[in-house]
Structures are given as C-alpha cells and as structure tokens.
Regions:
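A conserved mid-protein helix/loop that constitutes part of the nucleotide-sugar donor-binding site
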Residues: 311, 318-337, 351-354
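Nucleotide-activated donor-binding/catalytic signature segment of Leloir-type glycosyltransferases, i.e.
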Residues: 355-374
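Aromatic "clamp/platform" in nucleotide-sugar-dependent glycosyltransferases that forms part
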Residues: 392
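Short hydrophobic beta-strand element within catalytic cores of glycosyltransferases
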Residues: 409-413
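Conserved acidic donor-binding segment of nucleotide-sugar-dependent glycosyltransferases
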Residues: 424-426, 430-436
Length: 436
C-alpha cells in the first residue's frame, strides 16, 4: 500500500496545508506506511529546501516528471569529488568555499557553483553555470544528473529531464507565456495531459490511496477524477466548504460537482464533519464516508524557560485578507490606550503585508505593533502570554494548537471550526461572538 499526497505546491506563499502535509508525513512514517508526496511541477531549490525543513524526507518525495525517466532515485548521491572529476576541476579553480557552496572560476572568468545538500554530507544538490556573471544553466543531481534548466535573462526557457545515461526523456519548452511538453513521440500542449500520463506511470493498485489536499484549478484534478485505476481517492478539506449563509466556497465547487467520484472525504474536526454531512445531503450525495482526522500534532508540550514578556501578544498566519489581521491590529491599537505596555507581534508573510504595514502607520502603532516575517515559532511561543486570532474561520488552526501546547492564553472569534475546538471559554482563553 502506498499513500500519495497531491500535491506539494510550488509558486505560492507557505501556508498551513504545507505544515499539515509534513505532519502527515511524520505520522505515516511512524506507522510504517509507505507514503509519497508529489511535486506536480519542478520545485525551485528554495522551495524544495522549505519542504525538507518542515520534516519531509528526500526518499518520500515524488517528482512527477522524473517518472518519465529511468532514474531510480532523486536522493543526492553525487559527491563534490565525483563532480570535480567529471568537470576536470582542480584546487586552482576554486575561488570561494562556504558551508553551502563551492564556487569555481576559469581563465575566461566564467563560473561554476556547486550547491551542497545540507541533509547529505559532501553531496551536491545542483550546479549553476554562469557566463559573464549571468545564469545560463542549472543542473540537478541525484545518483546522476536528473534535470537541466536553461536560462535567458534570468528566465527559464527550457527544462529537460534525463535518463541515467543523460539522454533526454522529457522536455518542457517555453513558448511565450505558455509551455509545450515533449514526451516522445508526443508533443503535449497542456500540463493536464502530462498529469494524465504521469498517473499511468504510477501503476496504481487497489490498496493504494490518493489524498487530494487541493483540487480547484489544479491540472491534476481532472485526470485523477477520470482515472481507471482501482486505487481509492479521498479529498482533505483544509478550508471552510460552506459559509454560514449557505453559499459554497468556490474552492470546493469542483469537488461537490464530482463528489461521487471520491471514495472518502476527510475533515480536520468533528464540527466540520457534521456540517459536511449536511452539505452533501443537500447536494444529493449521501453515503460517502467522512472521517475526522486532525491535520497536525504536537511532538511535545513547550514550556517557557523563564518569565514571559508582560503584556505580550502574538499572532501567526499567512498574511491573507481572510485571516483579518487588520482587525487584530485595530483591536490591539484600542487596547493599547488602556494598556500602554501592550506589545503585539505578527509572524508570517503574504500579499497583505503592505496593507497591514500602512494600517500600523495610520494608527501610529509602529512602537508596539510589529510585522516579524517568518520565524521558528516553536522557540517563540514560550516568550509570549497571549495568542490572538481574528480569522473568519479556521478548519483546524495549527498555530492555535501550537500556542495552546506552549501554554498561551487564546483569544479568538467563536467562528468555525478551529477556535471552538481549541479555545475552552474561561479555561485557556476566551471566544468572542463573531457578530461583535
């Protein structure tokens, strides 16, 4: 049995789904269940490093386009010594060596940079080629060369995926703002068709399970729903699916339209499971099993090693309009009039950052409200007294769980589903009616 997770997202801000997927990886690993987490697009080195930092392991990652090659592994195994021999490099070519990279320069001033993998000592993850200071090519390595990217003016024009003998098995070609995909003997004009052929490469069995963490506007959704393979298909709900006014969330329109194609649905809380059962009944889709499985877990409780900063409040989330961090800023600004010692730190990044920064300036709150960006929250929670959330809804609330595990007082709206799951009125925090 193999559990496939679709997908590890590329090109978007980090979010709670990423953390939930990493938690799933750790749990399945502990249970001894084979799991694969699918990159349906090739990740940048930075994005790959991000997912590995969350707790994913190289051997559990599945790169869709590499399935068209005869590669056996994508785990870095090429050592610095191996590549120095292949490139015929000497110590005289080395001009800079750091913990994470080795840079070589030649007589014509062109350069090579070996980028080392932090999880596999002395192994190279990728190599950059620079011509007159401009990036022209990047090669990725496992046991041998996996993929090559070709650049012009900092933009990728072509990406090739290699067999073990370095011949090209699959190719992506930029055509203006679109891409063509060359998979001999075919030339495919859209990525949905690439995903259809990728699924055939998996040779799915009846005991296998595919988990979709997202489906709306995803080019793998239609091939998965139309698959002939006997494997099971389940949808994991990470957001509100039906608003309290009865309107469906557009993110799940596709899911409800084809609900009968799914074998299971999974929610993060019992509360959402109850609402989903009602929604499916209204859609005429009774009988589909629904399981409530938390999307996160705590390895251990986090205790403060000293006194928490007095009157300290934090929130942590993607800076997105739905999170309504603007409300948190306004609330803290009002409270600051009565509690001048109040300090509020906002962790996370996102498209709302500039708007929130302007709001802080408008309220003249720069001295006590701060945007902190990304940080290792496990080390930060114990320094604060209160966790504040003003999100319109949370299907689970990973940061709520983490804050509760670190002993913070929790404040939030009495809104579905995470807040009433974690906040126990008068015990570990307070719920505010959303209408107020």
């Amino acid at each position: 049995m193999t559990i496939y997770t679709f997908n590890l997202l590329v090109g978007y801000e980090p979010n709670g789904v990423d953390v939930a997927q990493a938690s799933r990886a750790k749990i399945l690993r502990g249970l001894g269940v084979t799991a694969k987490f699918v990159f349906t697009t090739w990740p940048t080195p930075e994005k790959l490093a991000y997912y590995l930092s969350l707790g994913h392991r190289d051997e559990e990652l599945l790169f869709a386009h590499l399935t068209f090659t005869d590669q056996k592994t994508s785990v870095p195994q090429k050592t610095v010594g191996d590549l120095q021999m292949e490139f015929q490099l000497t110590r005289l070519d080395t001009i800079e060596k750091t913990e994470g990279a080795i840079r070589y320069q030649f007589a014509d001033k062109n350069e090579l940079t070996f980028h080392l993998d932090p999880y596999h000592p002395d192994c190279v993850r990728y190599v950059d080629y620079l011509l007159a200071g401009n990036m022209i090519k990047r090669e990725y390595y496992g046991a041998c060369k996996l993929a090559t990217e070709y650049f012009q003016y900092g933009r990728i024009l072509r990406r090739t995926y290699h067999n073990q003998d370095e011949s090209i098995a699959f190719e992506e070609l930029r055509l203006g703002e679109s891409w063509l995909y060359k998979l001999e003997p075919e030339v495919l004009t859209n990525h949905t068709e690439v995903m259809r052929r990728f699924l055939l490469q998996l040779s799915l069995k009846e005991e296998d399970l595919i988990l979709l963490d997202r489906a709306s506007r995803m080019d793998f959704a239609r091939p998965l729903l139309e698959k002939d393979a006997p494997s099971k298909l389940a949808m994991v709900f990470h957001s509100e699916h039906e608003f309290e006014n009865g309107h469906l969330n557009y993110e799940y329109y596709y899911v409800f339209k084809y609900a009968k194609r799914f074998d299971y649905f999974i929610t993060a809380t019992d509360l959402q499971k109850e609402v989903l059962e009602q929604t499916l009944a209204k859609q005429g889709c009774k009988g589909i099993p629904i399981y409530s499985i938390p999307v996160g877990h705590l390895e251990e409780l986090t205790e403060s090693q000293g006194d928490r900063s007095p009157f300290s409040v934090l929130t942590a989330s993607r800076l997105d309009p739905r999170k309504r961090v603007d409300l948190a800023i306004r609330v803290v600004a009002q409270a600051h009039e009565q509690l001048p010692a109040l300090q509020f730190d906002i962790y996370g990044k996102g498209g709302e950052a500039d708007n929130l920064r302007h709001l802080i300036q408008e309220l003249a709150a720069q001295d006590y409200i701060h945007l902190r960006g990304h940080a290792d929250l496990q080390q930060i929670y114990p320094c604060y007294q209160v966790y504040l959330t003003t999100s319109q809804w949370e299907t689970f609330g990973l940061t709520l769980m983490e804050a509760a595990g670190a002993g913070l007082v929790l404040l939030g709206f009495d809104a579905r589903y995470g807040n009433p799951t974690f906040i126990k009125e008068g015990e570990n925090g307070f719920l505010v009616p959303y209408s107020e």
